[in-house]
Amino acid sequence: MPSSDHWLQLQRNVRFGETDAAGVVHFYQLFRWCHEAWEESLARYGIAAAAIFPGCRDICQVPTVALPVVHCEADFQRPVHGGDDLRILLEPQRLNPGCFEVKYRFQLEDMDVARGLIRHLAIESESRRRCALPEPIDLWLEASTVGRLEPI
């Protein structure tokens, strides 16, 4: 298993096209960045996109469990500008056997500039009924807690 530093701490350079007329990041970009960071974290951990996300090219089998977003939050502490090199810290947490969330901290030179949170619920793809998280996500969540104290 790779070091969690490799898959829970990511980098992102803010592109000009992600900013508004004032040169600062438009609010909705943060949610896109959060989801992209989650996808990259899964890939770096060793989970193929096709194992989690339907519609992937060359997919052999459609995932039987979907992970829709059921809640999201975003807070900007400081303006984020085009050209900023951000560090993204992910903190996944299992909430129950069928639900988890990921907290995201966006830092510029060790200063928090934004935070995000996305919560996912596991549902059976066909019936849309709640179910347990798929095994790859369970393993990713478990590995993310190694060396970190969990609340009782």
From Swiss-Prot:
Gene Ontology MF term list: 1,4-dihydroxy-2-naphthoyl-CoA thioesterase activity
Active-site annotation: D20
EC number assigned by the record:
3.1.2.28
Superkingdom field: Bacteria
Enzyme class (EC, first level): hydrolase
Which UniProt key words apply to this protein?
Hydrolase
Q: Which InterPro entries match?
A: DHNA_CoA_hydrolase, HotDog_dom_sf
Q: Name one Pfam family in it.
A: 4HBT_2
> SUPFAM superfamilies this protein is in?
Thioesterase/thiol ester dehydrase-isomerase (SSF54637)
- Can you state which reaction this protein catalyses? 1,4-dihydroxy-2-naphthoyl-CoA + H2O = 1,4-dihydroxy-2-naphthoate + CoA + H(+)
Does the record carry rRNA-binding as a key word?
no
Question: Carries keyword Hydrolase?
Answer: yes
Entry's Gene Ontology BP terms:
phylloquinone biosynthetic process
Give the pathway listed in the UniProt entry for this protein. Answer: Cofactor biosynthesis; phylloquinone biosynthesis; Quinol/quinone metabolism; 1,4-dihydroxy-2-naphthoate biosynthesis; 1,4-dihydroxy-2-naphthoate from chorismate: step 7/7
Q: Which family does it belong to?
A: Belongs to the 4-hydroxybenzoyl-CoA thioesterase family. DHNA-CoA hydrolase subfamily.
Query: What does the record give as the function of this protein?
Result: Catalyzes the hydrolysis of 1,4-dihydroxy-2-naphthoyl-CoA (DHNA-CoA) to 1,4-dihydroxy-2-naphthoate (DHNA), a reaction involved in phylloquinone (vitamin K1) biosynthesis.
The protein's name is 1,4-dihydroxy-2-naphthoyl-CoA hydrolase
- Which species? Synechococcus sp. (strain CC9311)
